[in-house]
């Protein structure tokens, strides 16, 4: 059994894994994981992935996946910890933090083509792949297909 700190660390690490699942084009079981419960589609995907692939307790899944819908929680600190970590990791300034959940433009229809960015992408673009010494340097080549689908298959095999 994990401690609460360990559970919150897991929730914080996995809270946006749904963005990966969306881009990998996995199917969402809408009847069980509704966008309306979580406020954003990627959060519903996160809940499904954490339930299906990580077999996490539903309370832990909620700490993580409800990070955009705090008004529907009981106000416990655990929800706020993950939500605050999400905002801090995104580098939000205070005024952006206050308007974050109100901005519905965040998930437009073209989300699948929007590359997930990391700190290394600021200057150059890196291949979307597993971390490996053979692909740690940036590439000039552009992908001709959805690299997230390939990466998802590798993820499942691990």
Language model: regions and residue ranges:
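Divalent metal-dependent catalytic cores for phosphoryl transfer on phosphate-bearing substrates
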Residues: 1-152
């Amino acid at each position: 059994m994990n401690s609460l700190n360990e559970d919150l660390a897991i929730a914080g690490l996995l809270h946006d894994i749904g963005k990966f699942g969306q881009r990998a084009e996995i199917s969402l079981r809408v009847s069980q994981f509704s966008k309306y419960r979580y406020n954003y589609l990627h959060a519903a995907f996160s809940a499904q992935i954490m339930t299906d692939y990580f077999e996490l307790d539903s309370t832990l899944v909620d700490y993580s996946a409800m990070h955009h819908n705090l008004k529907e929680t009981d106000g416990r600190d655990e929800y706020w910890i993950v939500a605050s970590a999400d905002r801090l990791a995104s580098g939000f300034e205070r005024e952006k933090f206050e308007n974050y959940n109100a901005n519905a433009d965040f998930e437009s229809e073209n989300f699948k083509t929007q590359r997930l960015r990391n700190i290394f992408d600021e200057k150059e673009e890196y291949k979307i792949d597993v971390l490996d010494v053979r692909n740690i340097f940036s590439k000039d080549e552009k992908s001709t297909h959805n690299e997230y689908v390939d990466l998802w298959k590798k993820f499942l095999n691990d």
